Amino acid sequence: MLIIAQEPSQVTDKLRRLLDSFGIQYRVLYTNFETDVDKATISLASSFSYSSDEDYKGQPLFFNDLSVPLYWELWTLGITTYIFDGQDRRASIILRENLKDRTVKQVHWFGQGEKVLAIDDYNRYGWRTKQRLLDDEGQALIDIYFNRNQEEVLLHYIQEGYLIDQGSEGRDRIFSGKEDLTKAVLTQILKSDEPIICMDSNLIPILQLQQPNRLVYCSASHDGLEHIQNQVNHTLIANYYPQEERRSGLIYLAGAEQEGTKTFTPQAMVMTASENIEGLAGLVDAFPNIDFHIAAQTSMGPKLTCLEGKVNVHLYPGISQEQYQELLRKSSIYLDLNYGSEVSDVTLDAIENEHLLYGLESTVHRPYYKTLPTVYASYEELEQGFRQLLQQADFYPNALASQKEILRLAEREEILAFLTRLEEEKDDDLHL
């Protein structure tokens, strides 16, 4: 199965997690020029840079192992690392996300006055994949893509728009632009018997010519899809919609990730853009056996930081995507108690990860949550609901089943059956 999208997004992440949970093998093609990819991911550039399994082996390059000219040296100031030629700084090294590992993400090469003239990109396997050449104004001129042997394989003349494939056959291919290159890459990687889930509507006319009978479109929203539905075999919707808003002819995926095997753990989480979380301090004191994980994409205000000394409170200011996914995995409770806007679709992410959504009628971010068994009219009722959860062994599975029924989440077995039939080419009965 091949997923095609312009770039990684919440929707592609959800779809990949769903397929992983089903054990369905897939590949992903992003129609961008990313070169730091895993083995299941292809981009327009990586399709030229990576050619064997060996290319996906290795570790990020430790900064001190970076090759530099004789007598040049690396000099570190905290997390900032420079390359010196003995007199002047000739480059700066940008480290990968985990700064403690001190591995190389980019090298910015300097000209006169430390003006950046070129940028080298390094991948997670420790080799250079790209060099960008800049003009005197810092504008990109050319992107040069390399294979593991550091041979030039693709040139992208950015301002003119065209690209040159410097393949091993000794004969250059010229592409007039990104669309021309995309067609060539699709021809190269598509398998004749492979179903496609496409998230880029601009590619549908091209894909209709190459894979007309097993073409599925996937969108976050169900709005404005009428013209697309007529061009594909099936349409998947990743976001949640209440039953009364759903439209015929569409397959809704929200909730299909639930495997029904999660056991209750006394871990509660909330993602907030506001320091005002109704009743949080009282819950923290009333239920010392519950760990409260409070996350934000930015810094936190004093109403939250003052809780940091509590042994059952864990704060995550500026939370990373990896930390967020880990909280979703290990928590069983989501607190929809924060005022202000909902951060992304965090409540839906929590529900899809089999969290019980606890909240007040005055704080929940979606009106249809008010009918859930763990949404209450008062704080006192909310506290009592927490006590029931901790004292009654069957409360969590029963309330979770009720939550799923009220929200009419997708049935996992039906989605699995659909995807299985899609893989097996039984397209005459591909519907739910």
Segments (PLM) and residue ranges:
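A charged, aromatic-enriched C-terminal amphipathic alpha-helix characteristic of glycosyltransferases
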Residues: 391-432
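Conserved active-site histidine-acidic residue motif and adjacent donor-binding/catalytic loop
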Residues: 298, 316-327
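Repetitive, compositionally biased segments used for assembly/scaffolding
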Residues: 70-180
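Nucleotide-activated donor-binding/catalytic signature segment of Leloir-type glycosyltransferases, i.e.
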Residues: 302-319
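Catalytic binding pocket for nucleotide-activated donors in carbohydrate/polymer assembly enzymes
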Residues: 333-405
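Donor nucleotide-sugar binding/catalytic pocket of nucleotide-sugar-dependent glycosyltransferases
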Residues: 196-198, 212-264
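N-terminal subdomain of nucleotide-sugar transferases
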Residues: 1-67
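Conserved catalytic-core segment of nucleotide-activated headgroup transferases in glycan assembly
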Residues: 247-306
